[in-house]
Amino acid sequence: MCFSLNINSHNINGIILLDKQEGLSSNYLLHKVKRLFRVQKAGHTGALDPLASGMLPICLGEATKFSKYLLDADKRYIVSAKLGEKTNTYDATGIIINTRPVTINQAMIEHIMEQFYGDIYQIPPMFSSIKYQGRALYKYARKGINIPRSARLVHIYNLQILDWDNTHIELQIHCSKGTYIRTIIDDIGELLGCGAHVTMLRRLAVAHYHTARMITLESLQTAITLALRQTPNTLVQLNKLLLPIDSAVANFPAIKLSKDSVARVRKGQMVAVDQCWQSGLVRMCENKGETTYFFGIGEITQPGVLKPKRLLAEKYV
């Protein structure tokens, strides 16, 4: 992986994998982390419901330029659902609007789960942050207003039954961006004929990131407090808490450019590269001494031709 954190700058640039706790909003945690690091730019890469916990990648500084690649990435979740009760929010925060007896068996569950593999269409819940005429749908829902929503195409890579009985079901789901786990549970409940709603939801992974690098808000606050005491090495200590910027695009192949090519790319010009590069997005890197530095994302628009797409500010490389 190319090196991308400049510890000599007066800014913090990188990605923190926050372990979101249940009951807090993603935006609240985003602003909390932004204040803790004292950065001007910060953004999360896909909100979690207040009920949910787990991985919430937060991009700081220059890393926000590449947040879309995490927003577009696939996600992994573990979810528990209560059977026999349907709520207006599709989760335990809502009002129970229907109760039905539960009469299910293993064969029935497995047959229904088979319908949730591959490409599926789902209608987003009314209690969501999707905008309609400039306002979030949940604001209409709270007033009892139902807005027609179009079905959206999502992809389920894997859905595994972890546990079930006549009161609950627990699943692990690997899905594409934009998938509403609450909707999957509500749909499963309807197909089972008993209704269901989410009681626990935890995000296990975003793209290639693993839980081992997650940190809770409390642990982060403690680590930052300690770092601030270690002047003049405060910035070094703070940056140790972060993943490098190019970790957001680690799935793209890296291409090393000459000094002349780097200069042209920074002017927005396309450059020639080896013909072995046929198409797709790449991480652009340059050598400085014995170290290779990441400085942006480019696209091979045709064999042997590289077009710059998103660059780090030069002072951060």
Curated annotation (Swiss-Prot):
Gene Ontology BP term (one): tRNA pseudouridine synthesis
Record-level Gene Ontology MF annotations: RNA binding; tRNA pseudouridine(55) synthase activity
InterPro entries: PsdUridine_synth_cat_dom_sf, PsdUridine_synth_N, PUA-like_sf, PUA_sf, tRNA_psdUridine_synth_TruB, tRNA_sdUridine_synth_fam1_C, TruB_C
The enzyme's E.C. designation: 5.4.99.25
Keywords recorded for this protein, A-Z: Isomerase, tRNA processing
Catalytic reaction annotation: uridine(55) in tRNA = pseudouridine(55) in tRNA
Major enzyme class: isomerase
Residues at the catalytic site: D49
One matching Pfam family: TruB-C_2
Described purpose of this protein according to its UniProt entry: Responsible for synthesis of pseudouridine from uracil-55 in the psi GC loop of transfer RNAs.
Similarity annotation: Belongs to the pseudouridine synthase TruB family. Type 1 subfamily.
Protein name: tRNA pseudouridine synthase B
